[in-house]
């Protein structure tokens, strides 16, 4: 990694957004812990998976699974996590919209079912961009969110709406599901945190308590971000290593 960093230093110049766009407001990140409403179902699924891994691959593989490497490959646990979070998420969003009547909010998701569940409650005030949304429609949807005061909620699939659009009408970004690629979160955050934004941007990461969400954050996203920082900056400590900071903040809240 150190050799790669030295090589990159000789062929590239990295300019940080905070240095180039110094007038941008702050970005404030927070975790929102959510109790799983399907706790028993989730725990059974995880127990069954770990038992299967132990039987098939031995203790070491099972230990890795409990730390997310094996579990992550099982999308069923991720789907159970968001299924169990939905009630808490819906309640949180309704409270936000009631308490902030003049504000808009951006929601990023992964699964199609999550979007369907959200639209049951917010279809009258929401717009959606997902993978099969035509390019021409995307432009209209973004313009509607940016300019129509009646539209309060933007719901986007992170892969489809996390880059290439401007959503500065809102200063609140929410990640309802946790994926494995750290830079996808940073890119998606910046749909609101970009030129034209006048307010501090609040970013919320919704984590299912004692679930795969926390395991991905600790065991996958944090190490990946550290490796990225070492390759690009030559050090693992960086203000871009957001996931370690987020989890430290979560731990402080629970003390």
Pin down the residues of each PLM region:
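Hydrophobic residues at beta-strand termini and immediately following loops
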Residues: 32-34, 129-131, 206
